[in-house]
Amino acid sequence: MALIDVLLPPSCAGCGRYGSLLCDACRASFRSASPAAVTFVQADPAVVVGESLTLAIAAFRYEAAVRGALQRLKYGASARLAVPLARAALPAFASLLQVSGRVLVVPVPVHPDRRRERGYNQAALLARVLARGAGVPVNELLVRGRATTKQHHLDRAGRLRNLRGAFQLAHGARPPPAAIVVDDILTTSATLEACAGVLRDGGCQVVYGFALAREV
């Protein structure tokens, strides 16, 4: 047990019970955002397709314990929570890899101001754990050069307009033939679509998207 866990015992992000960052009961309560055997059709509520984005799926429904855990990861200065969350999502991530083949994992970037405020980029933390668990490479190829307004009140078209020009390739970055862009929450897929557009413009031929949870 780590010293920090002795001095400050962790509590479950889902139910608040002390002993772990995410207890077994809450992890077991995570509801899949798609059928166990993922069928990659547009009618599937867990699957999204777009102009630049070939395909995107989410592991879980954004509800109950999943919502609490992702909100704590994003706003509660709990970087360690990325590990159990990403590990829980590995089966869904592996199902996407069966379709995508060998790819580079690319996290959705946050603006430098937001990164300083939180101390980390939650999408990058999740992407590293997913990539390590699946045995595929990860690289922060994208940067967020422009801060954007809050998007929760915008529809998909509004979000795409809001994100126009927000993402760029990092200096010297060379996109691979295929990539998976990773984010924490999938709502309209506008963020994944915007990132995919930059990667495609940079030479990437196929871009997939993966999120821990989807609002349904």
Question: For each predicted feature, which ranges?
Answer:
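Glycine-rich phosphate/pyrophosphate-handling loop used in enzymes and phosphotransfer proteins
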Residues: M1-V216
